[in-house]
């Protein structure tokens, strides 16, 4: 005989609750019914899932293996049911989105009107933070971030890849000259980040093939500020291409050291806590970002 969802639900609840009585209370069932269902499940499987003592319950080796699988199955069933129910729902409510200012200005804000036209009942709240934040403490539903995840409690949806470019304004180059090698950057005014210091190691390689670390003449906490400084002729900067592509196309900024620039790309992700995965307004926003940014940005 095959197991059914009721047996999986009861077994998982017993394990998570730590006792038959607490599981029965949470499931609104009699203790005897809970015990009988778990026993029936064990008989179907032909193994003992639980070690029973008068003081506590514990999983057998087979029980631990089965519990992990049963838990995942129930989560997938719940997610599938939610998705089917959501087909007839209208995405609505407030969606709080956090990102560094350059991403807000150059990626999110230009798409806001289109998103609002498609989903008029979702109210976007755009917040700017330069560093990593605790999404729960800040009451943020989703954040856009560069780089890999270092929080195992987060999920990520890949949006696009970006390269870094070294650029300067025509005015700066006319006054100070154009560097022809990475080493010549030492004689120029380089613009860098206040923090983290790792962003001041640029994506250009020196004669030994190593990334070049600058000594900034000006520093700022935001890539958008550095872009403004660069546009005003204050110096040379290294920024992500999504931030400066339009300026380059319009002739406001000039790419430098193309042959020495690394081809390495950096992932940009939308990150959120895993328990937000079935939130309908979050899901449609993620799909929208992947559609728009994936189609319109290239690494």
From Swiss-Prot:
Keywords: Activator, DNA-binding, Repressor, Transcription, Transcription regulation
Family annotation (Pfam families): HTH_1, LysR_substrate
Induction pattern: Negatively autoregulated.
Alphabetized InterPro entries for the sequence: CrgA-like_PBP2 (IPR048071), LysR_subst-bd (IPR005119), Tscrpt_reg_HTH_LysR (IPR000847), WH-like_DNA-bd_sf (IPR036388), WH_DNA-bd_sf (IPR036390), YafC/CrgA (IPR049755)
MF terms (GO), sorted A to Z: DNA-binding transcription factor activity; sequence-specific DNA binding
Regulation: Activation and repression activities are enhanced by the addition of alpha-methylene-gamma-butyrolactone (MBL), an inducer of NADPH:quinone oxidoreductase.
Segments forming domain HTH lysR-type: 1-60
Domain of life: Bacteria
Biological process per Gene Ontology, one example term: DNA-templated transcription
DNA-binding region, residues: 20-39
Record remark on domains: Each subunit contains an N-terminal DNA-binding domain, connected via a long linker helix to a C-terminal regulatory domain.
Family: Belongs to the LysR transcriptional regulatory family.
Role played: Regulatory protein that activates transcription of mdaB, encoding a NADPH:quinone oxidoreductase, and represses its own transcription. Under the same experimental conditions, no regulation of transcription of pilus and capsule genes is detected.
Subunit description: Forms oligomers. Forms an octomeric ring-like structure in solution. May form hexadecamers when bound to target DNA.
Name of the protein: HTH-type transcriptional regulator CrgA
Species the sequence originates in: Neisseria meningitidis serogroup B (strain ATCC BAA-335 / MC58)
